[in-house]
Amino acid sequence: MGRSPCCEKAHTNKGAWTKEEDERLVAHIRAHGEGCWRSLPKAAGLLRCGKSCRLRWINYLRPDLKRGNFTEEEDELIVKLHSVLGNKWSLIAGRLPGRTDNEIKNYWNTHIRRKLLSRGIDPVTHRPVTEHHASNITISFETEVAAAARDDKKGAVFRLEEEEERNKATMVVGRDRQSQSQSHSHPAGEWGQGKRPLKCPDLNLDLCISPPCQEEEEMEEAAMRVRPAVKREAGLCFGCSLGLPRTADCKCSSSSFLGLRTAMLDFRSLEMK
């Protein structure tokens, strides 16, 4: 639900006010005061909107309005109020008796704004124009410095990555050259396969005590059976070992059977065994 219209638009006049309408409005306000602007047009016998009557009275018909140009004091006051209040023309008009907000706004845009620019003052910020440009230049310079520092940082990181890749490449080439020099200095026969050196076999140093195995016992028994024949053979001289008759110099311990040497028999028995 919005506000109801102040009057019926179908039965209201629009456009410029006539002299008769101005006289009726002034006479009614002098007699009855401003009152309610919604009911005032009907009471004054005007076919006008209440808003139109209010603006006509405030901006043109009220007796305390000042006519003529603005003075220098009014110009300075408008500039000071604008620096504090901004474009709130109704509040500025309340501090200037006899001046309307619409009149002050038009005067600002046509005269005071140009006057401030000619003095080198920004009409929006009320500061010198050179200072405003200097602050803009400083901000742009700071942004350029920040961008340059950021670019330098990126370049430094990129250079570090390039140096790391270069160092890795040199290390790989150095290892390849070292392996090639080792392969040339050590032949294939010395290193086995030509690439890896010979390794010592893994020795089991765990000691344990266990009875001898059966194969070792059999080997020891065979050695005991062979030892007597070897001893007899070792007790013969060269002539007796060949079966020759015993001489006076012979000192062999072998016995004779029927005047025959038993050396050959011993050898046969040894061979049979």
Swiss-Prot record:
Protein's organism: Zea mays (Maize)
* HTH myb-type domain ranges (all copies): 9-61, 62-116
User: Where does this one sit in the cell?
Assistant: Nucleus
> What is the purpose of this protein?
Transcription factor that negatively regulates the expression of caffeic acid O-methyl-transferase genes (COMTs) and of other genes involved in the biosynthesis of lignin, thus preventing lignification.
Record-linked Pfam families: Myb_DNA-binding
An annotated GO BP: response to wounding
Protein name per the record: MYB31 transcription factor31
List, in alphabetical order, the Gene Ontology terms for molecular function in this entry. Answer: cis-regulatory region sequence-specific DNA binding; DNA-binding transcription factor activity; sequence-specific DNA binding; transcription cis-regulatory region binding
Induction is noted as: By wounding. Triggered by MYB69 to repress lignin biosynthesis.
Q: What is the tissue localization of expression for this protein?
A: Expressed both in roots and aerial parts.
Q: Name one GO cellular component term.
A: nucleus
